[in-house]
Swiss-Prot record:
Its main location: cytoplasm. It comes from the Bacteria. Homodimer. This is Aspartate--tRNA(Asp/Asn) ligase. It is an enzyme of class 6 (ligase). L-aspartate binds at residues 174, 220, 457, 498. The gene is aspS. InterPro entries: Aa-tRNA-synt_II (IPR004364), aa-tRNA-synth_II (IPR006195), aa-tRNA-synth_II/BPL/LPL (IPR045864), Asp-tRNA-ligase_1 (IPR004524), Asp-tRNA-ligase_1_N (IPR047089), Asp/Asn-tRNA-synth_IIb (IPR002312), AspRS_core (IPR047090), GAD-like_sf (IPR004115). One of its GO terms (cellular component) is cytoplasm. Its EC number is 6.1.1.23. It catalyses: tRNA(Asx) + L-aspartate + ATP = L-aspartyl-tRNA(Asx) + AMP + diphosphate.
Length: 599
């Protein structure tokens, strides 16, 4: 018999009476009146092993094993005694009567119990190897594998070719910071780790590969949040000779396929489509969570002449906005709840949170409860009631500031209330999956500090055909052929139709204040390639980490990555990053300069 004949978690009634050889780790050892029970674990699950004292040598070994010992068990599969079955285990109706027990490798005492659900993330990441033995982590990483496998199967069936692109490439600092790699051979010069394979996949379209994909690592040296990592995995795709609509249809179908085949979820037969401007107007976000039923109401125009300066000042400011958020049945919220929400929106730059409780609509002003009502004239109050559709028992929250602050703060409040216990109890949030496409993004954003336009997506995104004329006259009016796929408030993918004509690409560079010499230095290889009959092309990139996080119901993308970094971009397991030897620095012609001490 080989070292292992079956996986522990796959031993069931079909093997009754058969001798099996199992290998795994001791999850738990119990001594019950002279009989020792071992829960043996491998990647497929648990099986109960019974060690009877009749076999003295084997029993003596069993007495010495402890949690996380790596062992081999040989024994016979039998039914568990009546009343001792475990419906929670696939192997719960059987047990293995041990004939032979071999300790393949002992274990020191683990720093924690693997079934402890209250471990700090620091402990888990420091002892990641043990953490990965936990069933939930095993499940998450196998789910990740299945998602990648289904993506490959789907794209292969549609004629896509998996092509690797370079990991050592040229630094083009437009956007997030690059991770730089010094060149020993070319002193004083640096490679950059790719933020995405963007330019290479466009070059592959020019090179007539027609349909490309790869599941690849990307790197961005940016401040980290719960859903960000310095290195992350992208499902990167590009295709030639398809329109924007055809590209969206193709990858919408792929998304449906992957969700159905991996977790059995049937996404909408047709995803909703929403322009960027509508998403910002209704939800204050370009990745709205459509499960939450609350929406903004625009009030800027109605608040221009009120005596309440908190409203009238932003209403009369170029970039100002006044918006309301009606919460059905919110009148039952306590003053403590309101104060808590007020402090919450301050996180997003809001100076405060105005509110009105609707006690009785029919009474007009007299039916409202709020410290701000006295500062609003009748026309403003009528506009609030009519536009929000307020009913008795509701509360209306208001945000008034620069549009970005209003969108960020009221958008965050919308999600907080919707997903709260109050929101769930009052039907303000739906269960399930709500996918949509957000389209018609601005081509450019204006950077006040740099006094120039910057690319809202990236500088290789094509403007809409009817907006080409604005590139040189009014770039702020340009909309892009860009699209994001959003699911339950998470952007899981984004892409665009690309610029495929050299003259248009040069115009975009000029709009970004990238001069001809700088453009040639940074992107000359792309501009040259576009002159050789480049085809119309476009694509998309999905965030594999985010998709698996959502499918697994995990708290963080760190729970679906085998060896992740912390929010300080550190690997607690290997202690990276670390100092390097002075000799290595000399070989790279690098001298370290100590950071200046802050006063």
């Amino acid at each position: 018999m080989s070292m292992r004949s079956e996986y522990c978690g796959l031993v069931t009634e079909h093997l009754l009476g058969q001798t099996v050889s199992l290998c795994g780790w001791v999850s738990r050892r119990r001594d019950h009146g002279g009989v020792i029970f071992i829960d043996l674990r491998d990647r497929e699950g648990l099986v109960q092993v019974v060690c009877d004292p009749d076999r003295a040598e084997m029993f003596k070994t069993a007495e010495g094993v402890r949690n996380e010992f790596c062992v081999q068990v040989k024994g016979v599969v039998r039914n568990r005694p009546e009343g001792t079955t475990n419906a929670g285990l696939k192997s719960g109706k059987i047990e293995v009567l041990c004939h032979e027990l071999n300790v393949l490798n002992a274990s020191v005492t683990p720093p924690f119990q693997l079934d402890d659900d209250n471990l700090s993330e620091t402990t888990r990441l420091t002892h990641r190897v043990l953490d990965l033995r936990r069933p939930q982590m095993q499940h998450n990483l196998r789910l990740r594998y299945r998602v990648a496998m289904e993506v490959r199967k789907y794209l292969d069936s549609r004629g896509f070719i998996d092509i690797e692109t370079p990991m050592l490439t040229k630094s083009t600092p437009e956007g997030a910071r690059d991770y730089l790699v010094p060149s020993r051979v070319n002193a004083g010069q640096f490679f950059a780790l790719p933020q995405s394979p963007q330019l290479f996949k466009q070059l592959l379209m020019v090179a007539n590969f027609d349909r490309y994909y790869q599941i690849t690592k990307c790197f961005r040296d940016e401040d980290l949040r719960a859903d960000r990592q310095p290195e992350f995995t992208q499902i990167d795709c590009e295709t030639s000779f398809l329109s924007e609509q055809e590209i969206r249809d193709l990858f919408e179908d792929m998304t449906r396929h992957v969700f159905k085949e991996t977790i059995g979820v049937e996404l909408d037969a047709k995803f909703a489509v929403m322009p960027y401007s509508e998403a910002m107007s209704r939800f204050g976000s370009d990745k709205p969570d459509l499960r939450v039923k609350l929406e903004f109401t625009e009030l800027t125009d109605a608040m221009k002449d009120v005596d309440f300066k908190v409203f009238s000042t932003p209403a009369n400011t170029k970039d100002g906005r006044v918006a309301a958020l009606r919460v059905p049945k919110g009148g039952e919220l306590s003053r403590g709840d309101i104060d808590s929400y007020t402090e919450f929106v301050r996180i997003y730059g809001a100076k405060g949170l105005a509110w009105i409780k609707i006690n009785e609509v029919a009474k007009g002003r007299d039916g409202l409860q709020s410290p701000i009502v006295k500062n609003l004239h009748d026309a403003a109050i009528a506009a609030i009631i009519e536009r929000t559709g307020a009913q008795d028992g509701d509360i209306i929250f208001f945000a008034a500031d620069r549009a970005k602050v209003v969108n960020d703060s009221l958008g965050a409040l919308r999600l907080k209330i919707g997903h709260s216990e109050f929101g769930k109890a009052n039907g303000l949030v739906e269960a399930g999956w709500k996918p949509l496409w957000v389209v018609d993004f601005p081509m450019f954003e204006y950077d006040e500090e740099e006094n120039r336009y910057v690319a809202a997506h990236h500088p290789f995104t094509s403007p809409k055909d009817e907006h080409l004329e604005y590139l040189e006259t009014d770039p702020g009016r340009c909309l892009a052929k860009a699209y994001d796929i959003v699911l339950n408030g998470w952007e899981i993918g984004g892409g665009s139709v690309r610029i495929f004509q050299e003259d248009v690409q040069s115009k975009v560079f000029r709009a970004l204040k990238i001069g001809a010499e700088e453009a040639r230095l940074k992107f000359g290889f792309l501009l040259d390639a576009l002159q050789y009959g480049a085809p119309p092309h476009g694509g998309i990139a999905f965030g594999l980490d985010r998709i698996v996080t959502m499918m697994a119901g995990a708290d963080s993308i760190r729970d679906v990555i085998a060896f992740p970094k912390t929010q300080r971009a550190q690997d607690l397991l290997t202690q990276a990053p670390s100092e390097v030897d002075e000799r290595q620095l000399r070989e790279l012609h690098i001298r370290l300069r100590q950071p200046e001490q802050k006063a």
